[in-house]
């Protein structure tokens, strides 16, 4: 060993693996650059199996999502955290890169949307090249806007915080969406509500408690509708709602891809 070389690198690989498995995916990747001994431990299945959900908690993926099986547990983690994978039921799923928590996106087609099949209010379902799903919902004319999406069973580790986000776009002729709407989240008999705004008007000031959208890196916008906490390992039902029924003005130009349910760091 050369002078100044890290003594910890002389530890057996199984001890290094046990220590790294108690850190985070980011820390394990950083440790791999320390030395060959660290790299062997940091890239091992023993470490990355601890960052992945248990096999029984990983839902089956849709056909064709893993054409080339990943190399080892680290490869599987990087695949599932690098981009969403479609599930057989139409949802998409990915892993949070920091915590390994499962995240989901529910497509607009699976949401309960008022008058969704009435052409007067909603155009036919449209396809956008930058959407994860074959169809997105486009609002044409709505005198009363109401959406109540429901994501079925959500399971997580003790005290895992999640938030749900509406992912959408506004076309060049959007209108009537600059007034605060009522968003809600319900889980385990607890209902939480907040005010949100889909299209802030720069000429109008909003109350401090009104949640505003932000632009995403993929060209869409997202609006946080609420958050909740998973306690324990039992599954539970969580539902989300968005409604604006006080101002009966027309609304249009909203294109909705779906609802994301993400771990909140």
Q: What residue ranges belong to the model's regions?
A:
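Short, basic-rich loop-to-helix N-cap that marks the start of a DNA-contacting helix
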Residues: 29
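Plant-skewed but cross-kingdom recognition/interaction modules and surfaces
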Residues: 3, 10, 14, 18, ...
